[in-house]
């Protein structure tokens, strides 16, 4: 099923945000809470069973023009249910694309509805599908979690970078594979009641940590050791790893609901970003155990980590022809086992101890015996009581220069016998009296791909037949088939529920598979699976956690009673004086920084005034309160005083009457009049003729604005009537001349207009809460001040921007900083930067904007006068940056823009080298002009050599440019432009000869066997009747491949991407049609061999989103 969605024109953004409710779920994927009809009681009908699955493709054109925060696909139906895909094109509060599967009609479904789905979401790479990013998960959808997916699906920097292949012609392709499964009753499920265990809350992407912590917790000997680590009542859990781990384990043992891990991650010294980074379980396991081992030193539990997890193996090299053997003993806490090419754990151990022969060019230099043939290998001296096996599901693919996940089937037994075949894994020094028979305790699972996914664990805490699945907050009982066989990996075929139709079976590649195994030695079982109870837990820890529980209960009550209270925020003159000119310049006050009171809604307002009297020392009868109001121009001003009748009401009644937004807050301004002795006095009576005005004073010499007070004036009076009072407030002479301006608004632009002092306030449309700014008029000399009047100063304050400038050559380093205005024109900006750099000609400056997602310069620089203002230079989609990059050109930018610069890789015919040349020519030039220019720069094999220009991408030739093609149509940002000499054999090609593409390739190991191209593609002339054997001789000579290596090469003709392997006697000519059009879909001759060539320095890495920060625990 394929859908094309038109770009949204007026799609309204939903009010609510997709963020987890901290009281419900802290899963790795945010959920959207859908409102259900409480009156409806019927449960949704069970789903029809046909079809159970569907692949849905969503094409999103004009992707970069999407201006909504959320964007939905059209609705599609799977299993009788309506679904849609939800994306956040600019990220859901992260710098990654966020993508979810959403229940399309969640708001209209009956009470208690639920559905369960296994699904994968993908962003398709439209240039090379192998680089598509796909993630898989499963979820129980319901009213409280009506969508599920991935907040950090892929970096926005990758998605929006055109060369990566995800955004082509401003179009993005998204795929969803959805299979509906049997519904589980999720929200009524009680893990503790059903299993006796509780789960761990997820901080965003910490399921990898949760699965490890559950595994360690369920090794009782380890848990007991953690409890016995010395801690004190003065330790803070957020600063002490032992105390935080003790606290976590205690809660897992005794809580009735899921446990948070924030204290523990804070004790690691992790910031929020770290907590949301998905790391590697093995890496975290090692770092955590090293930290604990270090903190256990000098305590009663010193050495516990070694006793549990440490084993030893012997590395040996033994000469074959002389009596010489070298051995080295090493310890291990876990073993890394190969998955690729191994059917099970035993095959991995066989490979681990496999003997390598050192001979030929790889002989071993034995001390006293020179170079010798030798055997090299590893054997185990002893295994630990708790054996941790890390399965190498992820590995680096050198051909693709990226990490890949291996989803091959890999089996592991319930009982692992490492004494098999007469102890073939053991060294001669091993203690043969120890029986190395192990029982499986835990299976840690990774679901997803190399770019992220979900982690959970199957554990049997007492080694009984009963398995449990620990999936973040949810713990369920599972059978052995779920814990073992379903975690082997490989492919899973979903059952066909409609046998009457001949539908092909729907296969899911099982992205969920075992990633780490924990085995416990049978002979140590009773010691490891020991009893742990309260007597193992320090008294101070029990007291602390009981107190925590009481505080948590208080918070719960606080939240439960929140609807009974309101918050009153009281602003005073003191607050305005404190804030204006320092923290804020516009309006009067930041209400987040004034005194707030939490008052029961039923409290009489008079009683609240008594609270204020105690707080501020102002008697009740001397207080007058004003209601704040948000005006249509988005300013916020005191609007009117509370009436005597209103003051007889309750706090809740006043809030409801005054607050159209119906939020929990009531904002008030407390008017306090003070006498000559600065003591409070009764406020003057206010009639309908009186208006309350606020005044700010501007000092143009020092560019300072401050609040000087307020006055009650008659609306019929004129500003000139209060000049004396204003001069007194400012500290001016009584008859000082002043200019007055009304501060009207500041969003989206500043509006500040001069007031005619001879016109009444009423005619000036001045009303309660208005702000008047005033200053002394300036002399001619003083008018040269940078901001001579109030409007210019407010304009400056609103638009000032501190811009960091960096050179394009050093895009990570700030060169200098300049304060500019967002209203500065293009010319203003380059003139100021040129002045800073001491550059005479500003037109020789070229600026480049900043990509907020990739944290790099944008690919295209800013054109000469290509933007109106500085603000246009700093905006990137919905983000605003404060960084600009600059470069100094050798010619003026307008002249340069008439030229086109192409980056051409010249492949020399005489030397094994590739040299990059930047060819700069007028845009109307042709490819022939590029070739002529290139000839002046490169060394040719002979004087009459002819050159051609090719378009190469992903190791395939897509095009030979005709010499007449204009270069303005060529884009070297997407493709590699390759120039080379035309071989003589191609010039002399006969009428029956054919010119074919020849590409190098290799096949991926494992079950997929996907073809991967690499190396430099080339053309080859083949003749009628010519066999592969004859062609091979020419290819070997052309590529200078040694006989020994060439003998291992295989040859195949490719059509539609499928190889057909050739024999030496096959006539190659017959496999290829004569065509003049070239493209990746064409036929080609494939050369299969290992890629041993070093990577070219100029080759772009096509897949860089596997970046992963290493795990660090700082404390």
UniProtKB/Swiss-Prot annotation:
Keywords: Hydrolase, Protease, Thiol protease, Ubl conjugation pathway. Residues 53-178 form the MATH domain. It holds the Pfam family UCH. It catalyses: Thiol-dependent hydrolysis of ester, thioester, amide, peptide and isopeptide bonds formed by the C-terminal Gly of ubiquitin (a 76-residue protein attached to proteins as an intracellular targeting signal). CDD domains: MATH, peptidase_C19C. It is an enzyme of class 3 (hydrolase). Residues 198-522 form the USP domain. Gene3D superfamilies: Apoptosis, Tumor Necrosis Factor Receptor Associated Protein 2, Chain A (2.60.210.10), Cysteine proteinases (3.90.70.10), Phosphatidylinositol 3-kinase Catalytic Subunit, Chain A, domain 1 (3.10.20.90). One of its GO terms (molecular function) is cysteine-type deubiquitinase activity. Disulfide bonds: none annotated. It comes from the Eukaryota. The active site is at residues 207, 454. Residues 1-51 are annotated as: Disordered. GO terms for cellular component: cytoplasm; cytosol; nucleus; plasmodesma. Disruption phenotype: The double mutant ubp12 ubp13 roots are completely insensitive to exogenous applied hormone peptide RGF1 associated with an accelerated RGF1-induced ubiquitination and turnover of RGFR1 and are characterized by a reduced number of cortical meristem cells and disturbed PLT1 and PLT2 expression. Recognizes and hydrolyzes the peptide bond at the C-terminal Gly of ubiquitin. Involved in the processing of poly-ubiquitin precursors as well as that of ubiquitinated proteins. Positive regulator of root meristem development that, together with UBP12, prevents the ubiquitination and turnover of RGFR1 induced by the RGF1 hormone peptide, thus influencing PLT1 and PLT2 expression. This is Ubiquitin C-terminal hydrolase 13. It comes from Arabidopsis thaliana (Mouse-ear cress). The gene is UBP13.
